[in-house]
Design a protein with these regions (language model features):
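Beta-lactam-recognizing serine transpeptidase/beta-lactamase-like catalytic domain environment
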Residues: 1-24, 29-225
């Protein structure tokens, strides 16, 4: 496996073949499933003292930061590990897995070049530790950068994923176009309302959250760090 062969790893296209623990960007998937399982998600409230406590272990926020009282927008913007591990602990793992697979985890990706499938590792046998770790982007779940870019693009496109392509057009020596790639809809990953709500959360990240360095940009920024 070239992915695990350090001597040849320079040959790997890390954008599509890299298998990485996602980190806090996975909170997008956790948030989407929480929204689907809890129609009153806008009433979410959590008090963060810097640590969430579970039986036999605890999960801390970055640098032990205590975020105080948070709604779901605040928890997402602050990337609050305490809030999201608590959210994850309350999710139905079967539904959580389905949401991840709706977003093409454990599925083929619409790519015409070599890639590695992203893996959502939770199932009915998973422990509380595994579930809470996964909900904050740690644990055994892995994803490629290209796959997360597809999810972000679908959120921007009202839930619809377009088929990625590399070559836009082919021109001859006279600069005449001899072949033009046509845009193709691949799949609807989420509803337009879900995408709209996730954009609101991602806007908060770049307005006052962990990505607030973008707050004064001369364009509207959405993100998750």
């Amino acid at each position: 496996d070239i992915i695990n062969d350090s001597s040849d790893s320079r040959l790997v296209n890390r954008a599509t073949q890299g298998k990485y623990i996602p980190g806090s960007i996975f909170k997008i998937i956790t948030t989407l499933d929480y929204m689907r399982e809890n129609k009153n998600y806008n009433k979410f409230n959590y008090y963060c003292d810097g640590k969430a406590r579970f039986k036999g272990f605890s999960i801390k926020c970055f640098d032990g930061t205590a975020h105080g009282s948070e709604d779901l927008t605040d928890a997402f913007a602050h990337s609050c590990n305490s809030a999201f591990s608590t959210i994850g602990d309350k999710l139905n793992v079967t539904k959580y897995r389905k949401t991840a697979e709706d977003l093409l985890f454990n599925k083929d990706l619409p790519l015409d070049i070599d890639y590695n499938q992203s893996v959502f590792a939770l199932d009915s046998t998973s422990t509380q530790f595994d579930i809470t770790q996964t909900s904050i982007g740690q644990g055994k779940t892995t994803v490629s950068p290209a796959h997360m870019a597809m999810i972000a693009s679908a959120i921007a496109n009202d839930g619809v994923l377009m088929k990625p392509y590399i070559i836009d057009r082919v021109e001859n020596s006279s600069s005449n176009i001899v072949k033009q790639t046509k845009e193709q809809k691949y799949k609807t990953l989420m509803t337009s309302d879900e995408a709209k709500q996730l954009r609101k959360y991602m806007s908060a990240v770049c307005t006052y959250g962990t990505g607030k360095i973008m707050a004064n940009a001369n364009y509207k920024a959405y993100g998750k760090t």
